[in-house]
Amino acid sequence: MKIFLDTAKIDEIKKGVEWGIVDGVTTNPTLVSKAGTPFKETIKQICEIVQGPVSAEVVSSDWQGMVEEARNLAKIDEHVVIKIPMTPDGLKAVKILSTEGIKTNVTLVFSANQSLLAAKAGASYVSPFVGRMDDIANDGMRMVEEIITIYSNYGFETEIIVASIRHPRHVLEAALMGADIATVPFAVLEKMFYHPMTDLGIERFLRDWEKYKAGR
């Protein structure tokens, strides 16, 4: 499974790339606004760091505006993927962009039905929001499981990006189900490194090594 970082912070992206575990980045207007730099400049900087897909979201609500924004964003770098909201106008834009070879990521997906429509419209990626589904007492990962089954049944090439991830368990479940990608906040990615038994093992090895050196 590929791991994307869900952030627009350059320092976090650099760390993830240095660790050798980041395959791409997803952003949204909220994340970019927190980065404190102009939108296009931020996306360009990210593309210079990550040699993989970088999702940049449109802000227009009508299909004409989405298509125009998407064409401009796609000029920034060949790795830019256009995030489009899951709406009728959004899917109309996705269909047009797919015929032009511009990759799209349909976002704000909350059902397998929506994912089916996104795939039929030609989306390159679809982003089901598992954490937000959990927030309203629904099973977000069950939705992902349904999407995987539908895509497998009909051979859709749309890749599934498990989004709105809140904790390492979401990442683990996504991997066990066979999702293509998990887009992970930096804080969650950091938590994935650690286990108390690992820390105890390191401490023991260091103590034993110090005893060995002292006895020589």
From Swiss-Prot:
Q: Which UniProt keywords apply?
A: Cytoplasm, Pentose shunt, Schiff base, Transferase
Q: Which GO terms describe its biological process?
A: carbohydrate metabolic process; pentose-phosphate shunt
**What is its EC class?**
transferase
The EC number(s) given in the record are 2.2.1.2
GO MF, one example: transaldolase activity
Cross-referenced SUPFAM superfamilies, in alphabetical order?
Answer: Aldolase (SSF51569)
Matching Pfam families, A to Z? TAL_FSA
Q: Where in the cell is it found?
A: Cytoplasm
Transmembrane stretches in the record are none
CDD domains reported in the protein's UniProt record: Transaldolase_FSA (cd00956)
Q: What is its main location?
A: cytoplasm
Task: Give the protein's biological function.
Answer: Transaldolase is important for the balance of metabolites in the pentose-phosphate pathway.
- Family (UniProt): Belongs to the transaldolase family. Type 3B subfamily.
The record's annotation in NCBIfam families points to:
fsa_talC_mipB
In its UniProt entry, what is this protein called? Probable transaldolase
Source species, please? Thermosipho melanesiensis (strain DSM 12029 / CIP 104789 / BI429)
